[in-house]
């Protein structure tokens, strides 16, 4: 089966393959995000201390056979039951180009 990779991050993702070629995966028009709220817990003087609550993902397409999605680590962690979500591995820089050496399933 052929697999299509779609980039749901708001930026290009550069991946260096096993042959040393760097592939640029362009982003889709609307990135996937985790919807969050911040609630004040207390103040230290005038500095607020907040608690973040996660309310679900937005703009994440349903599971589709033959398609995998590059997303942020936060999106992948929130929807950890999905096996079609990929995150970039550790990033490197070479000749001014930032890239990863692969994609990771959480």
Identify the residue ranges that each predicted region occupies.
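Intrinsically disordered, low-complexity segments enriched in small/polar residues
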Residues: 2-4, 8-106
């Amino acid at each position: 089966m052929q697999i299509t990779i779609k980039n749901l991050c708001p930026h290009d993702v550069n991946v260096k393959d096993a042959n040393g070629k760097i592939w640029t995966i362009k982003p889709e028009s609307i990135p996937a995000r985790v919807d969050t709220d911040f609630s004040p817990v207390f103040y230290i003087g005038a500095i607020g201390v907040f608690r973040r609550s996660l309310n679900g993902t937005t703009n994440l397409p349903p599971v589709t056979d033959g398609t995998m999605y590059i997303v942020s680590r936060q999106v992948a962690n929130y929807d950890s039951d999905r096996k079609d979500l990929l995150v970039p591995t550790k990033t490197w820089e070479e000749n001014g180009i930032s890239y990863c050496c692969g994609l990771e399933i959480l």
